[in-house]
């Protein structure tokens, strides 16, 4: 095996009767089609094999490129995905943000996704403005307007996401979204956390199926752009490993950068290398992981809701140059 590709999945949605049909994700039936097609074209590898590959302890003569399944954000959907993968004998890596376990709170992107999916843009923006006013943040500096008849829906959602990710400070972004969560979604859905995220019991069952878990920070900030203090950096990058290992009695050797683009992880590679807490760290930059690639800047292919099995195979073969 001269290299391997890694997949990054998020939502795996029901094939029918989805209670939140506007959540974009891979449908369960399409996910099965992905698995069946990928098993024919690639050698599916485990996290242990990925670690061995990066550190020179694996036979690299295999003709088929390797393929690793990974999942970000600790979503409730991943419990379904883990059981499906087990049916096919596949061991995946599930990257868990620890705030959902220790604080009982969702991560920022998931608040945005579910709130927009259920309430629509304008109701979300009303709650957003209320949150800004509540925390005495100047509304005019961060205001967003949406005109349904003239504005592009997807472009407006992208604008909203960028405000939370890059324009508001991370502390303000976090408290504004938690205000929206508590005063909108959680008020209407008392079981909100179970709808959005994995429970401790489900994570234990995922491990029992033979899968691995990894760290996805504590509360999902963009590490490189959030201007974290050294104390906050430790809480986000290293505390989760300690907590997950202590809670679930398992080794946590892999880390996944939240958002995963270069502006989100720049500079973090050197820190991870210096402290030796993790053996691998994954981005969402699309490339084949070869022996020359840094184990702390590994590539992944983010799977989108529009990716059919045929498109996925075509894109991955192009990346692997096979």
Region locations from a protein language model:
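C-terminal active-site subregion of NodB/CE4 polysaccharide deacetylases
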Residues: 1-70, 76-77, 107, 111-115, ...
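Metal-dependent polysaccharide deacetylase catalytic core of the NodB/CE4 family, i.e.
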Residues: 7, 12-13, 64, 88-263, ...
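Anion (oxyanion) recognition and catalysis
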Residues: 39, 86-88, 207, 274-275
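Conserved beta-strand->loop/alpha-helix structural units within folded catalytic cores of enzymes
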Residues: 72-74, 78, 88, 92
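Short alpha-helix within the catalytic core of nucleotide-sugar-dependent glycosyltransferases
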Residues: 79-83
């Amino acid at each position: 095996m001269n290299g391997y590709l890694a997949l990054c999945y998020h939502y795996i949605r029901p094939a029918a009767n989805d209670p939140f049909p506007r959540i974009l994700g891979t449908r369960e039936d399409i996910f099965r089609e992905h698995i069946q097609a990928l098993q024919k074209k690639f050698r599916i590898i485990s996290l242990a094999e990925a670690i061995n590959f990066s550190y020179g302890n694996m036979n690299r003569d295999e003709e088929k490129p390797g393929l690793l399944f990974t999942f970000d954000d600790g979503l409730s959907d991943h419990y379904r995905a883990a059981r499906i993968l087990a049916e096919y004998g596949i061991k995946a890596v599930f990257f868990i943000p620890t705030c959902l376990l220790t604080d009982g709170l969702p991560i920022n992107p998931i608040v945005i996704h579910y709130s927009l999916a259920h309430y629509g843009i304008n109701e979300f923006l009303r709650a957003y403005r209320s949150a800004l006013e509540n925390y005495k943040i100047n509304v005019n500096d961060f205001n967003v307007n949406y005109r349904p008849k003239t504005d592009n829906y997807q472009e407006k959602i992208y604008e909203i996401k960028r405000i939370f990710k890059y324009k508001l400070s991370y502390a303000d972004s976090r408290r504004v979204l938690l205000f929206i969560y508590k005063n909108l979604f959680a008020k209407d859905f008392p079981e909100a956390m179970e709808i959005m995220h994995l429970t401790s019991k489900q994570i234990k069952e995922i491990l029992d199926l033979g899968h691995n878990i990894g760290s996805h920070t504590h509360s999902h900030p963009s590490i490189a752009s959030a201007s974290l203090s050294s104390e906050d950096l430790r809480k986000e990058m290293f505390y989760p490993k300690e907590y997950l290992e202590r809670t679930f009695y398992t080794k946590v050797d892999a880390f996944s950068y939240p958002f995963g683009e270069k502006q989100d992880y720049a500079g973090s590679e050197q820190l991870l290398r210096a402290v030796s807490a993790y053996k691998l760290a994954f981005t969402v930059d699309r490339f084949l992981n070869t022996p020359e690639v840094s184990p702390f800047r590994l590539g992944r292919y983010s799977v989108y809701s529009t990716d059919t099995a045929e498109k996925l195979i075509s894109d991955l073969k192009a990346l692997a140059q096979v």
